[in-house]
């Protein structure tokens, strides 16, 4: 009887010892699950914070580059008239499509933006240039186009070239020439003859002008004597008689005036 009681007591003790061991293992498992869950949460929080900090740094870099590009655009020489140095037309810039980057929509990873030198991340907005196909951030390329109108990488023009309009041929209009009347022809011929005879007469003999009568009497010039210097007389003494008559005619004209 005593042996039976001892055996039952031993069995009951073993069962209590096993249940306490199971409870201890359950507590350890629960604690480990809680610790693992907290660790995962901490890792996710740290990853989110690091990603936010990295994107914030990229935004600062973009703003700094944008401010630098604005200063370059403000300090640019206004006398430069090259097409690549002129700012892009806002209407052309609005026609360039904008996309939102996502890993699901873009199977192959995009290249980094050449303006800010940072890679595209989730939900980043970008533009694809139509001619060369290069991809840039919206903020970066919009700031670039405020002072340039070409691609930052290949310098391909973004703005379409304006068609050259050829000037229309202008018909030449000649004024109609009216026939010259006989009187004009006669007067022109007489004037030509007089002009042709003038140099010949001047070269051969002095020109004689006809005496012109003055109707007014020379009242104010009465008693005026014109004296000719002796040197002038000596120098003109060797001239022919025609020159003397011309001199007398000129003196008479002065006297009449």
UniProtKB/Swiss-Prot annotation:
GO terms for biological process: protein ubiquitination; protein-containing complex assembly. A zinc finger (RING-type) spans 113-155. The chain crosses the membrane at residues 28-48. CDD domains: RING-H2_EL5-like (cd16461). Residues 181-209 are annotated as: Disordered. Pathway: Protein modification; protein ubiquitination. GO terms for molecular function: transferase activity; zinc ion binding. Signal peptide: none annotated. It is a single-pass membrane protein. Residues 185-206 have a biased composition (Low complexity). GO terms for cellular component: membrane. It is an enzyme of class 2 (transferase). Its EC number is 2.3.2.27. Keywords: Membrane, Metal-binding, Transferase, Transmembrane, Transmembrane helix, Ubl conjugation pathway, Zinc, Zinc-finger. It comes from the Eukaryota. PROSITE patterns: ZF_RING_2 (PS50089). The RING-type zinc finger domain mediates binding to an E2 ubiquitin-conjugating enzyme. Belongs to the RING-type zinc finger family. ATL subfamily. This is RING-H2 finger protein ATL5.
């Amino acid at each position: 009887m005593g042996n039976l009681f001892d055996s039952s007591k031993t069995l009951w003790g073993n069962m209590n010892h096993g249940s306490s061991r199971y409870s201890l293992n359950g507590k350890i498992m629960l604690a480990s699950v809680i610790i693992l869950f907290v660790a995962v949460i901490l890792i996710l929080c740290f990853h989110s914070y690091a990603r936010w900090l990295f994107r914030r740094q990229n935004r600062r870099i973009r703003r700094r580059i944008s401010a630098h590009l604005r200063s370059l655009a403000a300090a640019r020489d206004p006398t430069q008239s090259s097409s690549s140095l002129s700012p892009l037309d806002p209407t052309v810039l609005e026609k360039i499509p904008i996309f939102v980057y996502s890993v699901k929509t873009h199977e192959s990873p995009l290249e980094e933006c050449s303006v800010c030198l940072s890679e595209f991340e989730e939900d980043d907005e970008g533009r694809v240039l139509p001619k060369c196909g290069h991809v840039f951030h919206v903020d970066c390329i919009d700031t670039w186009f405020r002072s340039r109108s070409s691609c930052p990488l290949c310098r391909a023009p973004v703005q379409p070239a304006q068609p050259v309009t050829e000037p229309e041929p202008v018909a030449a209009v000649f004024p109609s020439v009216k026939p010259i009347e006989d009187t004009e022809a006669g007067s022109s011929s007489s004037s030509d003859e007089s002009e042709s005879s003038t140099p010949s007469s001047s070269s051969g003999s002095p020109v004689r002008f006809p005496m012109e009568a003055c109707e007014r009497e020379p009242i104010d010039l009465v008693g005026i004597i014109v004296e000719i210097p002796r040197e002038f007389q000596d120098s003109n003494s060797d001239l022919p008689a025609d020159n003397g008559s011309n001199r007398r005619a000129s003196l008479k004209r002065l006297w009449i005036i």
